[in-house]
């Protein structure tokens, strides 16, 4: 099983727009609905089924692999992506947290199994390192896109 968790502070640059919890939440919702502007390795996304206001099934193409995910919103706190089909199965969490110092942060956690790779193997460790680096880049891209949208006033707070 490939597991990793990283936390990135949201408001580190005083010259950038300050993102509130509401703005970050709205950005995460937008990312869940259409990840293309936020995650460079995702080339396609289609909502397959809406199960409720806080839950839907989507199909994404991630580095050429087609993956089905059940996406669940926990308002103002977390988005859960449960990968149910594809080569890589498991759970990805995008959480909005407050650190001990009170600063807002995004915590990205994944717990995944990879088809065709033996548990605790060198290949699994290499996959984990590559995936972790990809997620750090995705977090940076997500925050950059949120700031751009905030500057353009295209990122309204969730209502």
Where are these regions (language model features)?
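Beta-strand elements of well-folded, non-transmembrane domains
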Residues: 10-12, 62-64, 112-116
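Hydrophobic/aromatic beta-strand elements that line small-molecule binding cavities or substrate pockets
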Residues: 44-46, 68-72, 91-99
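Beta-strand/loop substructures that line and gate deep hydrophobic ligand-binding cavities in soluble
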Residues: 85-137
């Amino acid at each position: 099983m490939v597991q990793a968790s990283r936390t990135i502070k949201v408001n580190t640059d005083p010259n950038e727009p300050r993102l509130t919890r509401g703005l970050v939440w709205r950005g995460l919702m937008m990312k869940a609905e259409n990840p293309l502007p936020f995650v460079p390795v995702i080339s396609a996304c289609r909502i397959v089924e809406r199960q409720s206001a806080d839950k839907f099934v989507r199909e994404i193409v991630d580095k050429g692999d087609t993956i089905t995910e059940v996406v669940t919103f926990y308002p103002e706190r977390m988005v859960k992506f449960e990968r149910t089909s594809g080569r890589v199965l498991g759970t990805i969490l995008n959480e909005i947290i407050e650190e001990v110092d009170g600063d807002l942060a995004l915590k990205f956690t994944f717990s995944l199994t990879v088809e065709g790779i033996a548990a605790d193997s060198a290949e699994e460790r290499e996959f984990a390192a590559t995936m972790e680096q990809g997620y750090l880049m995705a977090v940076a891209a997500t925050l950059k896109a949120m700031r751009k949208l905030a500057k353009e006033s295209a990122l309204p707070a969730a209502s």
